């Protein structure tokens, strides 16, 4: 039986491990903290099939002065970190044009359009099935003018076959009074889903993996190297492990692990925040993206999660108050009557490459090391399918998308 090591126990790593295990491989997951302790824990829980518009887009350039100078900006920069990330930022912002947005949409759609079905297939026969539900994902616009300013965005989604319905905000509030008097226009995206507790979902999947004979090692990975044409060595804190293949999928921490391979990897953390309102006095019925404020309100089991924003401050900086205060102040202004038992604050690291596409494929000519990371805001959405693709690559099955779009060496000169 061939042995495989998966580095990373987020949704991408756990999904990969389960699909490989189902195909008959002996699989070990290594993670420095354990399953779903990063972005897979604290995301908004949306299976966002329509999220084919990257963060760097024409509107980002138009609003950049506001984002840099306003305390109400949904994009945050730690000024002392800017010099370090300046080359990344220049390349990242250079993608903020229609040609690059169209390219991204064309390449991301095949990875996420069937996200709910992919997650249902992944979770089938496990205790994690109960966390998945079909759910419209809504976008709220405070004015009709704001909606019309986004017309190109919706035309692009329509072009890629993503169904949606535009409804009057007042009529919508009859269905969901939580959002009463907030929006003139609401767009309901169909064929979407929700994970009711993303962290517990991934942990439950990992528990299933372990129950089927998989292994989980909690350790930092110090090095990976090729032993010979058949084996790869992974050095962890207290041991060295040998496997036939290694999958590198620790999200924003991938760059450090792969540094020795000298592959060009313009990767940064798009830091995201959430505030949870535990046992609130009233709930929304559906998840809502507040388009002007760039955060999502998601009803979850026993709480409301308010998640979003983008912050560039690196992996080492701890939670910062300005993004959290912005989320809390916005909720206080929008929902003055909302009360809760407790508020829980969280920071996570989304792995983002300059073109916003993941790295997915073999790193070396001997096909021993495979990478799967860089899904930025869409790790949960694309995670189940990414795991299946990795499994298919190793087995040699046909893959029904153009895998070269995500090749690891695409940034090499």
Region roles according to the model:
Residues 167-175, 217-232:
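A conserved short coil-to-beta-strand element within the FAD-binding core of flavoproteins
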Residues 86-204:
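Rossmann-like flavin
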Residues 13-14:
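N-terminal Rossmann-fold NAD(P) dinucleotide-binding loop
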Residues 45-46, 51, 55-95, 223-231, ...:
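Active-site substrate-recognition segment that forms the wall
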Residues 22-41:
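Glycine-rich FAD pyrophosphate-binding loop
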Residues 1-10:
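Beta1/beta-strand and adjacent pyrophosphate-binding region of the FAD-binding site
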């Amino acid at each position: 039986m061939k042995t495989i090591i998966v580095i990373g126990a987020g949704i991408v790593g756990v999904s990969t491990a389960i699909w490989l295990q189902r195909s008959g491989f002996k699989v070990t997951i290594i993670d420095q903290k354990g399953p779903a302790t990063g972005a897979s824990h604290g995301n908004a829980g949306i299976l966002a099939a329509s999220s084919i518009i990257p963060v760097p887009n024409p509107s980002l350039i138009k609003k950049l002065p506001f984002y840099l100078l306003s305390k109400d900006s949904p994009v945050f920069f730690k000024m002392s970190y800017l010099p370090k990330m300046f080359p990344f930022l220049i390349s990242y912002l250079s993608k903020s044009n229609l040609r690059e947005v169209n390219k991204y949409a064309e390449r991301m759609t095949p990875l996420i359009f069937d996200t709910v079905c992919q997650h249902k297939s992944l979770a089938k026969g496990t205790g994690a099935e109960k966390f998945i539900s079909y759910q419209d994902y809504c976008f709220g616009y405070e004015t009709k003018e704001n909606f019309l300013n986004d017309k190109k965005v919706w035309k692009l989604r329509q072009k890629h076959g993503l169904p949606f319905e535009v409804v009057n905000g007042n009529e919508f509030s009859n269905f969901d009074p939580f959002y009463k008097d907030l929006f003139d226009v609401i767009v309901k995206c169909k064929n979407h889903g929700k994970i009711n507790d993303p962290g517990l979902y991934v942990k439950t999947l990992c528990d299933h993996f372990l129950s089927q004979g998989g292994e989980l090692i909690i350790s930092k990975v110090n090095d990976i190297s090729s032993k010979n044409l058949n084996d790869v060595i992974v050095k962890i804190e207290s041991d060295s492990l040998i496997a036939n293949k290694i999958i590198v999928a620790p999200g924003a921490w991938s760059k450090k692990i792969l540094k020795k391979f000298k592959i060009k990897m313009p990767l940064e953390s798009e830091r995201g925040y959430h505030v949870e309102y535990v046992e609130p006095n009233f709930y929304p019925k559906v998840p809502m993206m507040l388009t002007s404020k760039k955060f999502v309100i998601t009803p979850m089991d026993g709480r409301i999660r308010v998640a979003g924003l983008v912050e560039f401050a690196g992996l080492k900086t701890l939670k910062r108050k300005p993004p959290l205060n912005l989320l809390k102040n916005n909720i206080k202004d929008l929902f003055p009557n909302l009360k809760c038992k407790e508020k829980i604050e969280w920071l996570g690291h989304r792995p983002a490459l300059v073109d916003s596409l993941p790295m997915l494929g073999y790193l070396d000519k001997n096909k021993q090391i495979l990478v799967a990371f860089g899904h930025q805001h869409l790790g949960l959405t694309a995670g189940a399918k990414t795991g299946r693709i990795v499994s298919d690559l190793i087995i040699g099955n046909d893959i029904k998308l153009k895998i070269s779009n995500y090749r690891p060496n695409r940034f090499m000169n």
